[in-house]
Amino acid sequence: MKTVHSASYEILRRHGLTTVFGNPGSNELPFLKDFPEDFRYILGLHEGAVVGMADGFALASGRPAFVNLHAAAGTGNGMGALTNAWYSHSPLVITAGQQVRSMIGVEAMLANVDAGQLPKPLVKWSHEPACAQDVPRALSQAIQTASLPPRAPVYLSIPYDDWAQPAPAGVEHLAARQVSGAALPAPALLAELGERLSRSRNPVLVLGPDVDGANANGLAVELAEKLRMPAWVAPSASRCPFPTRHACFRGVLPAAIAGISRLLDGHDLILVVGAPVFRYHQFAPGDYLPAGAELVQVTCDPGEAARAPMGDALVGDIALTLEALLEQVRPSARPLPEALPRPPALAEEGGPLRPETVFDVIDALAPRDAIFVKESTSTVTAFWQRVEMREPGSYFFPAAGGLGFGLPAAVGAQLAQPRRQVIGIIGDGSANYGITALWSAAQYRVPAVFIILKNGTYGALRWFAGVLEVPDAPGLDVPGLDFCAIARGYGVEALHAATREELEGALKHALAADRPVLIEVPTQTIEP
């Protein structure tokens, strides 16, 4: 007899969801019974790390990732990480074990009361099946919903007595289904946009994370070159959509209304592709657009298009739209922009290293196709200026700014891309939110490199304290941390690098290793 359990595993197998990220409780054990040999279970010691690892896996692989959380408490533990997954359009299929059906109403221990409401609004769809026989169909719906554009996390609560129930008749059709979705704006709209771009006196391109998510980086380069446009990365960048040493590359826009308007001044047409308009952060009011400028947004997310405070928008598949747009625009006779100058090396004067020096070492030694998982807000600008990123899928940063992303996401990304080297660059304040991911890296021998920038403070908060005129705020420093001791306690090799030479030696060693290595680097505090 085929059961809900066996039918569900067939559906997961059909969609390639054979890696399960989780931390089991009693509600989840029936799901894990007779765990298939062709599946692998990645245990995290805290659900925040579990969701973070799955997020990194989904981002780096471009495929959905499967998560199994423990009831309401485990869901709550993972929701901080879920904020990042939501804003990065990560297709996470999250399941949570529920009490047996007859015990939910009396709110027995581990009953997830009103389970469908718990993860909202951080999921695209949330559901608890009305009966056991509907579990396989609901699981199929969850996978399809997470995968269809705009991609996003979904959540399914499953009572644990459902797994042993008989599967419904016809359940085999679910595993055979294929659902595809791709939309292209109407030809007339594409022709109109192509004409506007071709006639523009001084157009500019602003690219967001969904360009990289669609693997459309090369198309963005073609468009910039054909129209001789400078290319900026949209503010609050969580991915790298454009090669950072290309002549058209201008850098990352600031996350402030006035700052964006100032840097885009002089452009008459702003084309934003694969990004919301815009992901602001610090409050710096001003004009949304420079005088005389128009804006057009191309996005895969109707919500992003609807909530933008200005400009026109086309909603469609990013890669298909860029490909079609390339056919509509005429080549420009303008000269290509001049490439940005490379920043000079900075002299070290003893004491903690400058973050810029750390990034220069990383840039010199990292493989060409390295994947950088970055979680150090105060050093973002210096990193983008000094580390070259060439290939798609080279950079991941917490899309909602939720701390605890870096270490787990680096582990997940390395699991997803075993042939590329993952280098996590994480601040000491951020690292502690996801520190248990080191145990998972050690247990599964995940050869990621973790570089901890140790400045003893929340550097970005230090900067914000100045901006907000709160110089006496408590709780901004994190002294007394020994990351080498912590890493070794979790089973990860750890090295301390206090000079440039020590860092070079440690990084060469880590890159040659077949296991995870953590490098602790005391650094100065700089402004974002």
UniProtKB/Swiss-Prot annotation:
Pfam families: TPP_enzyme_C, TPP_enzyme_M, TPP_enzyme_N. InterPro entries: DHS-like_NAD/FAD-binding_dom, THDP-binding, Thiamin_PyroP_enz_cen_dom, Thiamin_PyroP_enz_TPP-bd_dom, TPP-bd_CS, TPP_enz, TPP_enzyme_TPP-bd. It is an enzyme of class 4 (lyase). Its EC number is 4.1.1.7. Ca(2+) binds at D428, N455, T457. Pathway: Aromatic compound metabolism; (R)-mandelate degradation; benzoate from (R)-mandelate: step 3/4. The keyword Iron-sulfur does not apply. Its cofactor is Ca(2+); thiamine diphosphate; Mg(2+). GO terms for molecular function: acetolactate synthase activity; benzoylformate decarboxylase activity; flavin adenine dinucleotide binding; magnesium ion binding; thiamine pyrophosphate binding. PROSITE patterns: TPP_ENZYMES. Residues 377-460 are annotated as: Thiamine pyrophosphate binding. Binds 1 Ca(2+) ion per subunit. Belongs to the TPP enzyme family. This is Benzoylformate decarboxylase. The gene is mdlC.
